[in-house]
């Protein structure tokens, strides 16, 4: 993996990632394809919205279809017919989500399969082996996602376990498996600055190809998330990609880019599309509102997606009211293209030296003031 920093405006960075299956321009948003498919999308649809990289999930693909099937296809790329880069989450967050169904020990995590209730064991080494079979361009370490809220003592204990697991991930990925694909560390520590420092410094000692901010978008208030983003990205290596996991709303992505983050993923655009909530240049359209019954306009006149070029809001309203699956499909195409256009717009603005104007326009269209952002002296 190679990362080049091509430009900067304040803390916002313009970069380029060269991976096994292609080049990724940053800032970038990665559509989530948990089970080897982005919900409601054909692989060609994902190409049409100009996604550069997608995300798969180790935990779910391990449980179903299982490694044997994916091995027979020579990896995840051929299995799902996607020839561009893939990042796979290690499964740590999904295990965290199981709550009482899991037991965490030094060796790893034992849990009941949400599919059939059978006992499953996942460890740093097993996570690395799964991701090796998947042949992910970017492999994430197996960690424990610190819950919110957590006391200082709980968050510290959790991050220290994650650091010990991170060491094991690196050793297995590099030394045992000889995996040439990129391996990213994940910074934990909850909402505590000293613990975020401890986690980051521990990961830097081990050494990774990129660094992710974990443990956000887990129920904390937005102000807490912004506090972490004010503080942490600028302390992360300037010559390595920075990835904010599981975030989020368009405003959150803009604010994170302003603070120096490069990579994002979130289920929000796909999940919202299935509920008739569509992101547009001026904010949000809730298509089930009866005011759209006779609306002859496109969903977003500024959008170049298949949905906006071909269908009216009235038609989308009709599909939603009838419960047609096409509503979710067209909405997903639009929402994911919106997120691609958002990050494209930021890349262009960073290339052209107009990033501040981009941010001003983004908020002005929503009738909002631009929030404050740290400025380096």
UniProtKB/Swiss-Prot annotation:
Protein family per UniProt: Belongs to the queuine tRNA-ribosyltransferase family.
Annotated Zn(2+) binding sites: 303, 305, 308, 334
Keywords in alphabetical order: Glycosyltransferase, Metal-binding, Queuosine biosynthesis, Transferase, tRNA processing, Zinc
Catalytic activity from the UniProt record: 7-aminomethyl-7-carbaguanine + guanosine(34) in tRNA = 7-aminomethyl-7-carbaguanosine(34) in tRNA + guanine
Details of cofactor binding: Binds 1 zinc ion per subunit.
SUPFAM superfamilies associated with the record: tRNA-guanine transglycosylase
Active site per the UniProt annotation: 89, 265
GO cellular component entries: cytosol
Quaternary structure note: Homodimer. Within each dimer, one monomer is responsible for RNA recognition and catalysis, while the other monomer binds to the replacement base PreQ1.
Name of the protein described by the UniProt record: Queuine tRNA-ribosyltransferase
Pathway: tRNA modification; tRNA-queuosine biosynthesis
EC number: 2.4.2.29
Family matches, as Pfam families: TGT (PF01702)
GO terms, biological process: queuosine biosynthetic process; tRNA wobble guanine modification; tRNA-guanine transglycosylation
Swiss-Prot/TrEMBL cofactor(s): Zn(2+)
Binding locations of substrate: 89-93, 143, 188, 215
